[in-house]
Design a protein with these regions (language model features):
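N-terminal signal-anchor module of multipass membrane proteins
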Residues: 1-54, 58, 303, 309
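C-terminal ends of transmembrane helices
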Residues: 11, 59-71, 107-118, 188-199, ...
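Alpha-helical transmembrane segments in multi-pass membrane proteins
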Residues: 26-34, 49-61, 78-83, 87, ...
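Structural signature of hydrophobic alpha-helical transmembrane segments
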Residues: 43-56, 93-102, 171, 175-185, ...
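Membrane-interface helix-loop-helix junctions at boundaries between adjacent transmembrane segments
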Residues: 78-79, 84-147
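Hydrophobic alpha-helical transmembrane segments in multi-pass integral membrane proteins
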Residues: 92, 138-144, 220-224, 264-279
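Long hydrophobic alpha-helical segments that form multi-pass transmembrane helix bundles
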Residues: 118-189
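Loop-to-transmembrane alpha-helix initiation sites
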Residues: 121, 125, 226-234, 255-257, ...
Length: 310
């Protein structure tokens, strides 16, 4: 046991051989199938966007740590993971300079300003996407497939034109408009299986999050429960972003509460918000509640007497 490191999880503690760099390497491997399908559907431009985002994140982290005389951490691959996740949340037509700005913002403002890996209070890639949505809404919501501008399934559901939805089989394999890494649900499920196999994450947050969205969207009268699950970036957000170690709860009970909150907010934003998608802001809001959730769900120490009024 390394007594020089602070353990942030609740007891009991299980020690494993997985280091941060190994975990991030497996996350990159799990993300790879979605990236391959993004290039398959959108062409080499998708690969270029990925390279720009990853390079912007890695180089900005390197430059910041050099300027501030801090230990270099680009070898832990966390900046590369942030860059790839950001790229997956962007349309393939995004100007490359915007993608680079989003990567720099995610690393410098959201991650490094708060102390680096594990200290950020929200997911850096999602915060970068939120900043880009606020700054360049048109560029961030222009979708193409086979070079033709098209509406996303979520936009069709919100408009009530369910008869124009693509077949569910198309939505499962990704043949629809959307961000370059979010459309192929089969590829994302392969990544989910890899993360479960390596015990990088548990099933609780992704499954509860996705099912909550489907159930609540049905109760809210949207009329397409399966399409609501398969449309947009819900799978990408639930599997890879809502499960971020630094910004998600540490207990199973906390994960359940957190996942339900993410799902409820996503359903509310999709139904009544001005933007058809909702997972970005839902996860960011729930990230801010994680300290409260952890405090409320942390297991009581054996023999501890609960103080009056607490």
């Amino acid at each position: 046991m390394n007594l020089g490191k602070l353990v942030v999880s609740s007891s009991p503690h299980v020690h494993a051989e997985l280091t941060t760099s190994k975990i991030m390497a497996w996350v990159l491997i799990a993300l790879a199938p979605a990236g391959v399908m993004g290039v398959w559907y959108y062409g080499l431009r998708a690969f270029v966007v990925m390279v720009v985002c990853v390079a912007a994140c890695v180089l900005s982290e390197y430059a910041w740590q050099k300027l501030t005389h801090r230990p270099l951490t680009i070898g832990d691959l966390s900046a590369a993971v942030t860059g790839l996740m950001l790229a997956y949340n962007l349309p393939v037509t995004i100007p490359l300079w915007m993608a680079a700005v989003g990567g720099v913002f995610a690393i410098i403002v959201v991650k490094q300003f708060y102390g680096g890996l594990g200290c950020n209070i929200v997911n850096p890639a999602l915060a970068g996407r939120a900043m880009m949505l606020a700054s360049w809404p048109v560029a961030m919501t222009t979708w193409t497939l086979d070079g033709v501008t098209t509406a996303t399934p979520l936009a069709l559901i919100k408009a009530g034109t369910l008869d124009q939805l693509p077949p569910l089989s198309h939505m499962l394999v990704g043949f629809m408009g959307g961000s370059l890494g979010e459309t192929c649900k089969l590829a994302l499920l392969i990544g989910f299986a890899i993360l479960l196999w390596k015990k990088i994450i548990t099933w609780h947050v992704p499954v509860i999050y996705i099912l909550t969205v489907s159930v609540l969207c049905t109760l809210f009268g949207r009329g397409a429960p399966v399409a609501d699950m398969l449309a947009g970036g819900l799978f990408l957000g639930a599997i890879f972003m809502a499960t971020d170690y630094a910004t998600s709860p540490i207990t199973i009970k906390g994960k359940v509460i957190y996942a339900f909150g993410c799902g409820a907010l996503t359903a509310v934003i999709r139904t009544w918000g001005g933007y058809p998608e909702g997972f970005t802001y839902a996860i960011l809001v729930m990230n801010l509640t994680v300290p409260l959730i952890d405090r409320a769900t942390k297991p009581r120490i054996f023999g501890e007497v609960k103080k009056h009024g607490k």
